[in-house]
């Protein structure tokens, strides 16, 4: 795998032939594309692609998941309004009413759909093959 330390800003892209861990944020307009998994230890607001070579078993995980788009293998999910700055989450879910940060989440493919759920040991045991 590969580690990238720093914030990816709009217009910047990071590509990896393996999995990638971003220690920082992926801002709106920035993109990460990995043949393996994508893990963002920060806020994910850009375009995140895992399994870029068609691997539907890859996943995307982030401490704060607010992406404009997630692609896993051949599957794509987009933000409900394309404006993650308004604290919208994928499919229109928003932060808690008291504006507390959301818990770390993971996006994965199941039954030909991309699902985003809070990371738990049980879930990791299910999706990591």
PLM region descriptions:
Residues 17, 29, 35, 56-57, ...:
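Short, surface-exposed beta-edge/turn micro-motifs
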Residues 1-10, 51-129:
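Intrinsically disordered, low-complexity terminal regions
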């Amino acid at each position: 795998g590969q580690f990238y330390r720093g914030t990816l800003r709009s217009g910047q892209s990071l590509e990896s032939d393996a999995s990638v861990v971003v220690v920082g944020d992926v801002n709106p307009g920035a993109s990460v594309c990995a043949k393996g998994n994508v893990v963002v230890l920060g806020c994910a607001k850009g375009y995140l692609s895992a399994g870029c070579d068609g691997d539907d078993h890859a996943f995307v995980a982030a401490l704060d998941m607010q992406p404009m788009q997630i692609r896993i293998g051949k599957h794509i999910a987009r933000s409900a309004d394309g404006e993650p700055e308004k604290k919208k989450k994928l499919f229109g879910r928003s932060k808690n009413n008291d504006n507390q940060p959301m818990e770390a989440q993971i996006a994965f493919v199941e039954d030909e759909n991309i699902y985003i759920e809070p990371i738990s040991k049980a879930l990791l045991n299910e999706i990591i093959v």
